[in-house]
Amino acid sequence: MERDNQFIGQSGAFLDAVERASRAAPMSRPVLVIGERGTGKELIAERLHRLSTRWDEPLVTMNCAALPETLIEAELFGHEAGAFTGATRARAGRFEEADKGTLFLDELGNLSMAAQERLLRAVEYGEVTRIGSSRPIRVDVRIVAATNDDLPAMAERGEFRADLLDRLSFEVITLPPLRVREGDVGVLTDYFGRRMAAELEWHAWPGFAPHVQRQLEDYTWPGNVRELRNVIERAVYRWDDPEQP
């Protein structure tokens, strides 16, 4: 099933975030998405891309926390052969891969100051320079960045470039945690339950018993929608009698 079908809810804060994404999508300006883990930051990036004029160009994703600091710049901006130990051949970076499309940078706060400086140049001038080269390469990339860090506080401490934060904040979309999305636990529980039941080829979805539904709604869900989805899918998979709630 398509990932964007999981992007559902009825709470005001959630719908406001979706509306802001829809309104910003047609533009090529940077967007900063703020939210806890599991709230759907990557889904917002996909929505921004698919509703834009770049929809048929690449959507390239990079998790800035998934690589050691020594490799992040080479991964983002590419490198020439011999630029560092192990670089046996030239390689394009994520910016070049995303040319004419969208680059989604998750966990933005993990970027080193050196990588932030290079990123700022890419945003301001539309060009990148591979590691080991002095030749700038023109790129046309729309940037969507995401974080759960307090970037303004990091900027005050000198841990994040204030000028980069300003350039990436043309539109800021804040995704609410599931615990404050009134009514959405029930909506999502039913959706994930029905989807898993269909995958198991049940002829009907009995739903959860009222006391179970209350427990689900009372839980704080620190892992947000991702945690809820995993819990519901496992529960349905292990269901003893699909005829009974």
Predicted regions located by residue number:
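Nucleotide-binding/hydrolysis machinery
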Residues: 2-6, 10-15, 52-57, 131-142, ...
